[in-house]
Amino acid sequence: MRIINVIHSLLLVVTLTSFCSSQVKASSFKTGQLKNSRVKDAYDNKWGPLQIELKAANINPNEFDIYMRAFKQDAIVEVWMKNKGETKYKLFKTYDICASSGSLGPKRKEGDGQVPEGFYQIDLFNPKSNYYLSMRINYPNASDVMLKEGTNAGGAIMMHGDCVTIGCLPMTNDKIKELYVLCLEAKNRNNPVYIDIFPTKFTEANLKMLEANYPKNKVAFWNTLKPAYDYFEEHHWLPKVIIDKNGKYFYEE
């Protein structure tokens, strides 16, 4: 299991306590969600076709792990999946991010309009969102708290429907239905839903662009994200990401 020091050891406990306290039957979470008309509509319209796509990709619709990577400059979210018990993820689908706010670089305070960058999980599903459906990203993590500017790092960062945003990931109502269903299916089986957010893909050309156009403190931060990014690029497996006492990311195999 991927663990991020304080983040994935403590917040994973919070997540599991919130959604499946004392090992409540896995189906109860999904059953509760399906009482909401938007979730039911998402399942009625998307789950059948998604199951066909999953089977075509040799993914068992009844038991899978999901991992998402968001790239701000590229304006995409990659959905990677694997069967439970397998070691390697495979790219399942890529979705466009409909709108953006802020600039490349991490979120450091409330109201800065920034989309966070770092290593996160989906920790809440909102079936009655003002933006159709939404899933909360567990920002701020321990690193964000340590590196915040001022007294408040901000929060309530969502992946949601519609096509407007201040610091979130808007996916349109149509695409959030698919993403919500896929993530809900994983969460319903007590599987964590990881999402990592990067400024861009760390290609050689993009690294040169970042170094040429952004201040050294941002480049230094991105250099702490890159090793875990590179590890996944090579192995298609999530490394253990750790946060040190200064809020810096590093990883272990």
Sequence positions of predicted segments:
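Cell wall/extracellular polymer interaction/catalysis modules
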Residues: 24-166, 174-187, 193, 202-253
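A conserved hydrophobic position in a structured secondary element of the catalytic/binding core
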Residues: 171
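Positively charged n-region of N-terminal signal peptides that target proteins for export
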Residues: 1-5
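Bacterial N-terminal signal peptides
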Residues: 9-18
